[in-house]
């Protein structure tokens, strides 16, 4: 597949309009907001046609997204996405990678979220007729493998013909847009501030993609506040998101 075709596929897969199920998850952000742990924000003078003073939490949201990128996606999810991309024709290797994610993800809510989003993505690709999707769905339904998101991204996007670099871009951008979109729906920020955060985060994405990821045996994640928030999410009285 040529570069432009691969890039178009990456844009499609990373689009929030793509029905992959990721929009239902805040990955701990909702609990942090409810508990007042996201930060007080900064009072700034509003622009014309807005209130005189508004609360800007862009820095806090950007910090949350940066933490997820650096200490979870780059060192963990990206590792398994690339390993699955490389092993897309080897079902045994894919199920082993799936099992590693299951074992290394300590928070039950994160395991459930990764499985549910992964299986939602898989279901869409089965409906679209993506090569290899139906066969792997049979493995998931038979209970032979959990179907975690990074493994399915690597498998499915490889089978679509997406280039390795474009797969990583789609995954990183999709994570960022999902988190920032959650912040907007939680009333933490408006759409313009959300776009500023996404723009500000782009240099970090390119910086991380320039680094060699760890091997699956060395994969790790360390986002304690987010993980605790995810575990506490079910105790919230009002919940907009699944975690």
Swiss-Prot record:
GO terms for molecular function: nickel cation binding. It is found in: Cytoplasm. Disulfide bonds: none annotated. Its main location: cytoplasm. Keywords: Chaperone, Cytoplasm, Nickel insertion. GO terms for cellular component: cytoplasm. Belongs to the UreF family. PANTHER family: UREASE ACCESSORY PROTEIN F. UreD, UreF and UreG form a complex that acts as a GTP-hydrolysis-dependent molecular chaperone, activating the urease apoprotein by helping to assemble the nickel containing metallocenter of UreC. The UreE protein probably delivers the nickel. Required for maturation of urease via the functional incorporation of the urease nickel metallocenter. This is Urease accessory protein UreF 1. It comes from Pseudomonas syringae pv. tomato (strain ATCC BAA-871 / DC3000). The lineage of its organism: Bacteria, Pseudomonadati, Pseudomonadota, Gammaproteobacteria, Pseudomonadales.
